[in-house]
Amino acid sequence: SVGFKAGVKDYKLTYYTPEYETKDTDILAAFRVTPQPGVPPEEAGAAVAAESSTGTWTTVWTDGLTSLDRYKGRCYHIEPVAGEENQYIAYVAYPLDLFEEGSVTNMFTSIVGNVFGFKALRALRLEDFRIPTAYVKTFQGPPHGIQVERDKLNKYGRPLLGCTIKPKLGLSAKNYGRAVYECLRGGLDFTKDDENVNSQPFMRWRDRFLFCAEALYKAQAETGEIKGHYLNATAGTCEEMIKRAVFARELGVPIIMHDYLTGGFTANTSLAHYCRDNGLLLHIHRAMHAVIDRQKNHGMHFRVLAKALRLSGGDHVHSGTVVGKLEGEREITLGFVDLIRDDLIEKDRSRGIYFTQDWVSLPGVLPVASGGIHVWHMPALTEIFGDDSVLQFGGGTLGHPWGNAPGAVANRVALEACVQARNEGRDLAREGNEIIREASKWSPELAAACEVWKE
């Protein structure tokens, strides 16, 4: 008889193994599976494990040349999702050998590469994954991390303040630099290129870099504080991106930026390596994330993209606000905020954390709260995000009736007032508006901002 039995067979015979004990070296994934009508959950979960590891749709004779038991993904647990009809969380374990070291790109190609178009599934979402410590150690991670950044900038004991320069498209380089200078002069720590400011006909990248560097140094000289502007190095090719990073380094600026999802993980990891080698901080914007993470039942949760970014490398990453114009539930957001900045995060399903994650001292990433926030949100933001964060007010700075610099002053005064109140033991959640009102008595800039945006 032939060595193998040809034909299509049920995945669950090979890939559903409820008795499997997960290894410390396994990569674990939690998928939200919505099977097609009539497909049992075990078969759907096994199909995910198979298609994202060694499986193919039929038995092949070359299976005999390898050890499936060593290399196959295994669906080791399935649980129904409370309150949802025909939705399950399928837990899959992947042997470490399936993944190339230090490659977020390969990790994603394996885990989420093919399986999302699978016919037996109506929808599939990767909710969380556990990166084993052995695999974490193959990545450089963030170029510098939270502590090194504070030391470079000499800023301690408070969140950092930023502002995206608007209008995002159409300013000339010189006017853009002027807006940067005014914000930094007023008291912000950072200003930011918008994510879609790359190198367009109305403002080429080199001109922008030059005028922004000039703005930085002028503001630094006048305030005695270290200032930064996130120079967006995102480009059409990796070579061009590195060229921009090199020019930023030659100007001596402290920080550059990258759009990591549109730019891609390979480009991002290269840039992160360059940044560590050359003392540049790296700010990461998440343009395109909602394409991947907005649907509740299909795609990937942002916490997965955030963990991947920590492996690939970035010192700041945008993470929603909990308040403001973009959606984000508080506990869930705080869950992935801790995932990117803490060293050990315990499993906690109420915060959306499916696995305990040990980062074995990989540097942390500062979460960036940005999008529709203004001075009245400051107490809540300070309380929710704590000191290790960057609070970014675009319109909330530039929309000030007296101009950019007074807008920056208003934000800085509000922040310092909240930090002081917190340090004095006051309850920011309860007394927030009162704290801002008190501070505005001493700051006409803040008082004007309080008028424009009502609490």
Curated annotation (Swiss-Prot):
UniProt cofactor note: Binds 1 Mg(2+) ion per subunit.
GO biological process, one term: photorespiration
Modified positions (N6,N6,N6-trimethyllysine) in chain numbering: K5
Keywords, in A-Z order: Calvin cycle, Carbon dioxide fixation, Chloroplast, Disulfide bond, Lyase, Magnesium, Metal-binding, Methylation, Monooxygenase, Oxidoreductase, Photorespiration, Photosynthesis, Plastid
Cofactor(s) the protein requires to work: Mg(2+)
Residues carrying N6-carboxylysine: K192
InterPro entries: RuBisCO (IPR033966), RuBisCo_large_chain_AS (IPR020878), RuBisCO_lsu_C (IPR000685), RuBisCO_lsu_C_sf (IPR036376), RuBisCO_lsu_fd_N (IPR017443), RuBisCO_lsu_N_sf (IPR036422), RuBisCO_lsuI (IPR020888)
PTM note: The disulfide bond which can form in the large chain dimeric partners within the hexadecamer appears to be associated with oxidative stress and protein turnover.
Site keyed Transition state stabilizer: positions: K325
Main location per the UniProt record: plastid
GO cellular component: chloroplast
One Pfam family here: RuBisCO_large
Domain of life where this protein originates: Eukaryota
GO MF annotations in UniProt: magnesium ion binding; monooxygenase activity; ribulose-bisphosphate carboxylase activity
Family to which this protein belongs: Belongs to the RuBisCO large chain family. Type I subfamily.
Anything else known: The basic functional RuBisCO is composed of a large chain homodimer in a 'head-to-tail' conformation. In form I RuBisCO this homodimer is arranged in a barrel-like tetramer with the small subunits forming a tetrameric 'cap' on each end of the 'barrel'.
The protein, known as: Ribulose bisphosphate carboxylase large chain
Taxonomic source organism: Erythrina crista-galli (Cockspur coral tree)
Encoding gene per record: rbcL
